[in-house]
């Protein structure tokens, strides 16, 4: 080959090298830009993931809060229903206590009356009928008599007025009822006054 051809080949090689270097330089700028965008995207993704986790935590907290509030409302509703039920049951408590002396007086009148006297018989029948009607009416509202004669003594239901020895009764048994007790819907409003065997 001639010198001239060598020069042309060398020039062509130089131009080709320059073009490759230029392409590499252009590629390098694009790579740098792409890497910067990738880094920015990764940071943005990390921020979004953190925000998502925080939002999920808040949602879970709100759900727990709602569940607690629902449970509290349910408990309050249940307590209110129980209190209303109790108020209905025992609203008559004081009124029933005031009626007990009337029942006692009617029973005393029946016991004191001479059933053999013809003049007293119609009056006695009227008092007995009044007593029966009165007791029936108050029993409809949950008032019940406590008459524990012969039963074991129970301090929740009975009030011991005296204790006596008795060979005919077991120890700690009610021998005699001095005054009947009464309960209203399972709650004692007046304990029975009793004599207990020793």
Swiss-Prot record:
GO terms for cellular component: cytosol. Disulfide bonds: none annotated. Belongs to the GrpE family. The gene is grpE. It is found in: Cytoplasm. This is Protein GrpE. Gene3D superfamilies: 3.90.20.20, Head domain of nucleotide exchange factor GrpE. Transmembrane segments: none annotated. The keyword ATP-binding does not apply. Keywords: Chaperone, Cytoplasm, Stress response. Participates actively in the response to hyperosmotic and heat shock by preventing the aggregation of stress-denatured proteins, in association with DnaK and GrpE. It is the nucleotide exchange factor for DnaK and may function as a thermosensor. Unfolded proteins bind initially to DnaJ; upon interaction with the DnaJ-bound protein, DnaK hydrolyzes its bound ATP, resulting in the formation of a stable complex. GrpE releases ADP from DnaK; ATP binding to DnaK triggers the release of the substrate protein, thus completing the reaction cycle. GO terms for molecular function: adenyl-nucleotide exchange factor activity; protein homodimerization activity; protein-folding chaperone binding; unfolded protein binding. InterPro entries: GrpE, GrpE_coiled_coil, GrpE_head. Residues 1-14 have a biased composition (Basic and acidic residues). Homodimer. GO terms for biological process: protein folding. It comes from Vibrio vulnificus (strain YJ016). CDD domains: GrpE (cd00446).
């Amino acid at each position: 080959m001639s010198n001239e051809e060598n020069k042309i080949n060398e020039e062509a090689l130089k131009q080709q090298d320059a073009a490759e270097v230029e392409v590499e330089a252009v590629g390098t700028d694009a790579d740098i830009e792409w890497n910067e965008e990738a880094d920015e995207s990764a940071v943005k993704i990390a921020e979004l993931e953190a925000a998502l986790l925080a939002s999920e935590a808040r949602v879970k907290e709100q759900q727990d809060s709602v569940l607690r509030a629902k449970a509290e409302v349910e408990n309050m509703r249940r307590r209110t229903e129980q209190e209303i039920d109790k108020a209905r049951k025992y609203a008559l408590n004081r009124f029933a206590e005031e009626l007990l002396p009337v029942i006692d007086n009617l029973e005393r009148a029946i016991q004191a009356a001479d059933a053999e006297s013809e003049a007293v018989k119609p009056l006695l029948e009227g008092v007995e009928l009044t007593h029966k009607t009165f007791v029936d009416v108050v029993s409809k509202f949950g008032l019940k008599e406590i008459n524990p004669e012969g039963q074991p003594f129970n301090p929740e239901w009975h009030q011991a007025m005296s204790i006596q020895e008795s060979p005919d009764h077991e120890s700690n048994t009610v021998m005699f009822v001095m005054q009947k007790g009464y309960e209203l819907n399972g709650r004692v409003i007046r304990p029975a006054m009793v004599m207990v065997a020793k």
